[in-house]
Swiss-Prot record:
It comes from the Bacteria. Transmembrane segments: none annotated. This is Exodeoxyribonuclease 7 small subunit. Its EC number is 3.1.11.6. Pfam families: Exonuc_VII_S (PF02609). Its main location: cytoplasm. GO terms for biological process: DNA catabolic process. GO terms for cellular component: cytosol; exodeoxyribonuclease VII complex. PANTHER family: EXODEOXYRIBONUCLEASE 7 SMALL SUBUNIT (PTHR34137:SF1). Heterooligomer composed of large and small subunits.
């Protein structure tokens, strides 16, 4: 994939970013990539990893836990970590 054909990392969904990251890891593990290209795809992999971590963190912040009253009836929601 040429530089102009690579989608911007920030615009990728979590699933697409992970799939591309897995592809990069597989290519690097095979060891048949030239040094310059290895460095280039490694750097893209780092950007993909950071993007995935950001998306996961945002998802964790949105997850809520249902708060129950003493009778076990739903009474509202609170952050999953109790903060």
């Amino acid at each position: 994939m040429t530089d102009s054909a690579k989608p911007e990392v920030a615009g990728l969904s979590f699933e697409k970013a992970v799939a591309e990251l897995e592809s990069i890891v597989a290519r690097l593990e095979r060891g048949d990539v030239a040094l310059d290209e290895s460095i280039e795809i490694y750097e893209r992999g780092e950007a993909l990893k950071k993007h995935c971590e950001t998306l996961l963190s945002a998802a964790e912040n949105r997850i809520e836990k249902i708060r129950l009253d003493r009778a076990g009836k739903p009474q509202g929601v609170e952050p999953l970590d109790g903060a």
